[in-house]
């Protein structure tokens, strides 16, 4: 499947928020240098940014969420259709589907420092689900599933570094992690109150409902 392989900082700055595409717990400003011409201060042109239309705001929110989870447009729309056909609030179900992706769960458990790195671990068969090798990043993890790093991959430096970052960042309440054994349990689907507050999923619902 095609993936964006360009500058990650560029995407975060375009969306005006840290999409956590680069590892580390530092703020975006210290992870990425400002995109500006040499010797030119940001905003030196004196131009006021154009005001986005309602559609523009909705589109930006969709792009922000899609890029955060590393999902291409076709698959993102598929997630929305599935959420819309499910019981419950469409926006919340959409976020639960995104959070339930195996690559995202691997990231949340601290086995990968970014979702992109977690996706690589999955594709390289370094991750087991209930003792079975799964190499599909979009695999939907179910409550009660056991996720762990394959034994021969536990000594990888990137896995150790990722866990150190996760310990500083903290773990989400819907997962349980044994940071010594590098294994965890997906206890339940996340509640909306536990999901990122900076995401406004209602804007995405409005966009696709047109």
UniProtKB/Swiss-Prot annotation:
The keyword Ribonucleoprotein applies. Residues 100-160 form the S4 RNA-binding domain. GO terms for molecular function: rRNA binding; structural constituent of ribosome. One of its GO terms (biological process) is ribosomal small subunit biogenesis. Keywords: Ribonucleoprotein, Ribosomal protein, RNA-binding, rRNA-binding. Gene3D superfamilies: Ribosomal Protein S4 Delta 41, Chain A, domain 1, RNA-binding S4 domain. Pfam families: Ribosomal_S4, S4. One of its GO terms (cellular component) is small ribosomal subunit. One of the primary rRNA binding proteins, it binds directly to 16S rRNA where it nucleates assembly of the body of the 30S subunit. Belongs to the universal ribosomal protein uS4 family. Part of the 30S ribosomal subunit. Contacts protein S5. The interaction surface between S4 and S5 is involved in control of translational fidelity. PANTHER family: 30S 40S RIBOSOMAL PROTEIN (PTHR11831), SMALL RIBOSOMAL SUBUNIT PROTEIN US4M (PTHR11831:SF4). This is Small ribosomal subunit protein uS4. The lineage of its organism: Bacteria, Pseudomonadati, Pseudomonadota, Gammaproteobacteria, Oceanospirillales. The gene is rpsD.
């Amino acid at each position: 499947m095609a993936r964006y392989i360009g500058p990650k900082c560029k995407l975060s700055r375009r969306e005006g928020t840290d999409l956590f595409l680069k590892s580390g717990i530092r703020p975006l400003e210290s992870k990425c240098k400002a995109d500006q011409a040499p010797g030119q201060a940001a905003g030196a042109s004196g131009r006021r940014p154009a005001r986005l239309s309602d559609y523009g705001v909705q589109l930006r929110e969709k792009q922000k969420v899609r890029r955060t989870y590393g999902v291409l447009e076709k698959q993102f729309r598929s997630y929305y259709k599935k959420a819309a056909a499910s019981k419950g609030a469409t926006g919340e179900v959409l976020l639960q589907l995104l959070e339930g992706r195996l690559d995202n769960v691997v990231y949340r458990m601290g086995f990968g420092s970014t979702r992109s790195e977690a996706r690589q671990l999955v594709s390289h068969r370094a991750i087991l689900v209930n003792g079975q090798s799964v190499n599909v990043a979009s695999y939907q993890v179910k409550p009660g599933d056991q996720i762990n790093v394959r034994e021969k991959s536990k000594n990888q430096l990137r896995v150790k570094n990722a866990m150190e970052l996760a310990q500083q960042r903290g773990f989400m309440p819907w997962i349980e992690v044994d940071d010594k054994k590098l294994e965890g349990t997906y206890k339940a689907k996340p509640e909306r109150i536990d999901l990122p507050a900076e995401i406004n999923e209602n804007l995405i619902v409005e966009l696709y409902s047109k």
